[in-house]
Amino acid sequence: MTDKIDYTKKPLTLAEQVARLKQRGLVFDDESEATAYLFNISYYRLRAYTYPFQENGEDSEHTFTRKDIHFKDIIDLYCFDRRLRSLIFNTIEKIEVAVRTKIVQVYAESTGDSHWFNDESLYRFGYDDLMDRIDADVNRSNEDFIKHYNSKYDNPSMPPSWMALEVVSFATLSRLFQSLRLDSRKEYITEQFGLKKVAILENWLHSISNLRNCCAHHSRVWNRRFMVSVILPYNTLYPFMDRTTIGQIRTNKLFAVLSCIAYILDIISPGSDFKKNIKELLKSDCRLLDLKDMGFPGNLSPFAGKIANFVFIQSDQQIVNLSVPVILDSSSYRVCYFNC
């Protein structure tokens, strides 16, 4: 292991930040405008958007690898990513609410227990850690219904499931579902999201939760490699993707997670504008945008401005827009996402 050293870099003025970027090869059309952007967005945040276009070796000067990149191009890419994050974040809310509702309803109804989530026998692992997470999330909440419960009741100390699980984070909710023992209730919830295997839904919720957190904390998502790779199933209750399509997808990139989100939305929110809005966003005239950076299959990249539909089912005879889930013979149809 390399020995650690002292951090000796000094802060830069805004003018010095512009000069640094110019020295490295970034083109500025209006330095005063660029200075204003840097004062609002920050040099360090924009670094995530310049990094892919710079030499970044250990002893590198971080020179731009292309001589035609303007500061405006970096801002355009940043703004595209910001709009993308906003769209994704607002969309995930629907999935998050649906997951909360189904878990609470199914387990509360089947157990007849308002506080079923406290029952250790329901879990296969991680009970103590999960209870600590739920307790922390509930105690952190400022919701009036939590305050009302705490002011009126002293036993149980935790509010009922429909209150407590309403305020826990999506990450905690995902962890709860993963920790629950495999039984018919868990399988039933999985089927409500169009999936046949519980492990797939567990993976999807984990992946979507991670993406949600990136959006919530204003982290870039456009070219991110996610820590959790998405499992893309060959066999689902409704049309998804065929084996050939799945084999072309990088499962740790954004495209894979968006495909899962789109599939779930077609089930829980038919007629959602998500696919339409993604299609419009991908028409961006951002010069640095390359769909391959988002994990799109490479042959789609040249058509960034010509996306016809987010999801379609293609056969030899016809193309059918998929606005609601339908069961089709998978032998005669091929399901693709973001195709042209």
Pin down the residues of each PLM region.
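Acidic, Ala/Val/Gly-enriched low-complexity intrinsically disordered segments
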Residues: 316, 320, 324-329, 335
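Long, contiguous internal "core" modules enriched in hydrophobic/ aromatic residues
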Residues: 2-316
